[in-house]
Regions:
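Short helix-loop-beta junction
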Residues: 111-125
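Long amphipathic alpha-helical segments
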Residues: 1-90
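Active-site-adjacent loop and "lid" segments of alpha/beta metabolic enzymes
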Residues: 100-108
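Cofactor-cradling patches in redox/metallo enzymes
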Residues: 118, 131-190
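Peripheral docking tails and interdomain loops at the edges
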Residues: 184-235
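Residue-level detector of anion-binding/catalytic polar loops
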Residues: 38, 123, 146, 199
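A short glycine-rich beta-strand->turn/loop micro-motif centered on a GG-aromatic cluster
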Residues: 123-133
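Conserved hydrophobic helix-helix packing surfaces used for dimerization/oligomerization
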Residues: 96-97
Length: 235
């Protein structure tokens, strides 16, 4: 299905989400799936762009808080519905521990990534946002995942992410663990992934799946050593 078709679905669905029209949303989603769109494509090409649009509209005060809440909660229901229909791959032996920004919109973005990673065969622990850096460090030291993923983070999370990555490098308890970032502020600030020291970067949930599936030599960036450089502010 071409991009124009997905854009049309987004443009039709978004007003119903903002209005909190649950019946209309169910009808539109069912119609889209009935036209042959896979659940994975719906999440990547419809739910994710709407998620990003909601963040932008809310950040620039172009929608009221009540509309943002309506849309975010209804979109989560849609995402929950989609993940039940994902094709499931066999386990690939790789573990992911995933965190995201603390807002509900960021949490929804993290959920999309977690759901698609799990469907692709990764073992996923998704803790959401608001977790202290000490707890993240302890959890990764205990679980020793193949990947620590910090996805769909807000601008205010960037210094904390840098701190977490620097501490992981300094402690050295998980030398083989790669750190991936993406979505959220990392889509709005060129070079931020490199600045915080991430080894992999992805723009969307499905892009994250492909990035983590790629061989290390293909996807890895050279992680910089801990340094006091200041991160520029990002909206």
């Amino acid at each position: 299905m071409n991009a124009t078709r997905f854009e049309s679905i987004v443009e039709t669905l978004l007003p119903s989400l903002l209005a909190g029209d649950r019946s209309a949303v169910r009808t539109l989603v069912s119609r889209a799936l009935g036209s042959g769109i896979s659940a994975e494509d719906f999440t990547e090409q419809v739910a994710w762009p709407i998620h990003e649009a909601l963040h932008k509209l809310h950040r620039h005060d172009q929608i009221e808080r009540i509309s943002f809440n309506y849309a975010t909660r209804l979109l989560r229901q849609v995402v929950d519905q989609m993940q039940l229909a994902y094709s499931r791959a066999e386990r690939n032996g790789k573990c992911v521990t995933l965190f995201c920004g603390s807002g509900e919109n960021e949490d929804l973005g993290g959920q999309m990534a977690a759901d698609l990673l799990e469907a692709a065969g990764f073992a996923v622990q998704f803790a959401g946002g608001g977790v202290a850096s000490d707890e993240i460090l302890e959890e990764t030291s205990r679980r020793r995942p193949d990947f620590l993923v910090l996805f769909a983070s807000s601008a205010s999370d960037a210094p904390g992410i840098r701190s977490v990555i620097d501490r992981v490098r300094e402690v050295g308890a998980t030398p083989d663990m790669e750190i991936a970032v993406g979505g959220g502020v990392f889509n709005r600030a060129d070079g931020l992934a490199e600045a915080v020291g991430a080894t992999r970067n992805a723009r969307t949930p499905l892009d994250l799946v492909r990035t983590l599936q790629a061989p290390s030599a293909t996807a890895r960036q050279t992680p910089p050593k801990a340094r006091p450089a200041r991160l520029r502010a990002v909206a």
